[in-house]
Amino acid sequence: MQHTLKALGKMDVQFHFNEVLTPALLDTLQEMQDVVCASMDVVRTCLPEAEPDQALMYLESPALVCGVTDGVLDSAFGAKKAALTVDRLAQKLHPSNTRGEEGAVSTRLYTSLDGVSASSQIPCDGIYSKEEAIAEAARCIQCHCDECIKACPYLRHYNKFPRLLTREIYNNVSIIMGDHVMNKPINACSLCGQCKVVCPNGYDMAEVCHLARQNMVETGKMPLAPHEFALMDMMFSNNEAFLARPQVGFDSCKYVFFPGCQMTAIAPATVRAAYQDLCARLDGGVGLILGCCGVIADWAGRTEMFEENQALLQEALEKLGNPTIICACPTCQKTLDGMATTKTVGIWQTLEEIGLPENALDAPRVVALHDSCGARGDADTQDAIRRLAEKLHCEITPTVYDGDASPCCGYGGLTQYANREVAHEMAEMCLSRSDAPYLTYCMACRDRFAREGRESMHILELVYGTSADHCPDISQKRYNRLGLKQQLLSELWEEEFAFMNVPFDIEYTEEAARAMDDRMILKSDVAQVLTLLRETGEAVLDEETGISITRARLGNVTFWVKYKEIDNGYLVVGAYSHRMNIAPRK
């Protein structure tokens, strides 16, 4: 006690001992001080008839702050109310002025009770013993909400709750000078919206990250590098590989088939079969658009580029007579729905109306159905896919996080370009839900799962009895798009379309091909470097290995190619790239 009194004495606290508790004492104190606080024992002794306002901890006459009731929790809460009353009195306000919400309130904290066993209170006789107190305290389940963390590999990877992550993202966006250390986390989010679904309060990290990307692009704070390859791929789809034609024999069409850039890159045979089927069984003409819906630019936060892409598609649709778009990709359908003058429908709904084609695979199998991020919140698409799978005699095994709560495969939001480690963890999360083969209705999901070594198939592969390339590399994907365009132009519209060919042979070792795919170096990039080599002759030869190396600056990237000369061409044994510019000394 003496130690406590001494410590309080250093805080400008005065003590008066042996005072007689009378109303006169309270009057004297009030004349000397702005605010007087008294315990209920003092109030009952001096003013036995007084009844303080328990909500304000205040006695109007005489003006005293008091009224703490019995109990530890009541006393703690009473002290908080009394402190607020003192603050109001010190400001010459009435204690009831602008106090806000006080007392017991309904918490927004959600705590899952999955796996929690019910337990009864430890009985005690008056006071707990040490052992009893420990046992009673051990019953606490440490209430907390981590529903989003459990569901999202992105949040688990950075080990941060959304509130903290949002604050750090805000700081990253707001700083003018200094390092933007949160760029990679901002770009690693798949923007899939799963967190909003699983969060009891609907917190949406996807919206936070998307707005951050848009803001940083607009203010020039977001470098192009993390998304440049994906954006260039989108531009390729809507330039060299782009095709927009009405059905043969029609000037305008009632429908147009839009398979999306991933299906044309991974499963061109499926696109061809689906288009021929739709043309044969739908009246009014079915046009075809091979291209990208533009979501890649939207994911990258490049609003201007996204709007330019929308304008390109709108122009193509107007030339076809503004037909209903039959989409083979839920993300394309969701993106194209945002165009004011378009009407979209999923090919799965169309197949429900016209029935399955004769060559549909009728092979009973057990599958795990992975719902696409693009179909989140779209019950019609999810239900149509399940009915279509049932008609194909697929038995769908239940999985956690399905439907609207389905996780992203790692392609959405361009995660696989910005942070491959997170994208790999996302794919693993998806595949950990079942050991069965995976059935998808998004070709990007099918490709991601195949790259992780899991048997996977797109539902249209079953519908049309076709098979996609197992895991086409980035160069093969571009070749597939061009090849499909060339084939359809020749077969249906009798038009010629020629690839750009180099006048020499280029071969690749298996190691070089794998490294190029991993480093996102296209065979067309290598061809350009070697074409420039033949013009300049600039290369360095390692006489011990016989390997030469040359380089060229293409756009924002410098490519280095290791090669050996062979008959009429080159054998590429390695390649890498960087963003430094190599300039000759002046």
Question: What spans do the regions from the language model cover?
Answer:
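Structural motif
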Residues: 34-35, 254-256, 323-324, 366, ...
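Hydrophobic alpha-helical positions that pack around
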Residues: 369
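Ferredoxin-type iron-sulfur electron-transfer modules and their immediate structural context
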Residues: 2-28, 33, 37-188
